[in-house]
């Protein structure tokens, strides 16, 4: 917990991607409403991936944290977010203090080809 606190309070930028269903269409079918929520969450996740890729390309370090999924009310309260917003993640951004080179595992060790 202390490490997360340090990451959150020392990062130059903190992005809190959120979902709001407030402006979305509502349907009488609960399954359709659930599908709409899932699509909204997926859209936010894809936007986050693009943000992470753009940050890397710009030489920024980024860290995806999923803590808001466990304490959404706390995140909304601390950041004074609208009650309809559902925080999905936190992304810290900044220039890395040090550069670490990681060896990549072969693609075949991570992908199953059929």
Label every PLM stretch briefly.
Residues 19, 67-68, 95:
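Short secondary-structure boundary segments
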Residues 55:
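Hydrophobic pocket-lining residues that define ligand/cofactor binding sites across diverse proteins
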Residues 70-84:
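Short, electropositive alpha-helical surface patch
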Residues 88-114:
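C-terminal helix-cap and adjacent tail motif
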């Amino acid at each position: 917990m202390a490490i997360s606190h340090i990451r959150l309070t020392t990062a130059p930028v903190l992005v809190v991607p959120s979902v709001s269903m407030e402006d979305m269409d509502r349907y009488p079918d609960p399954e359709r409403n659930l599908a709409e929520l899932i699509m909204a969450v997926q859209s936010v996740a894809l936007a986050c991936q693009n943000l992470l890729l753009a940050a890397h390309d710009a030489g920024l370090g980024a860290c995806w944290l999923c803590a808001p999924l466990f304490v959404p009310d706390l995140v909304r309260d601390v950041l004074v977010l609208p009650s309809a917003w559902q925080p999905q993640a936190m992304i810290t951004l900044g220039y890395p203090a040090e550069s670490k080179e990681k060896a990549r595992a072969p693609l075949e060790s991570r992908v199953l080809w059929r």
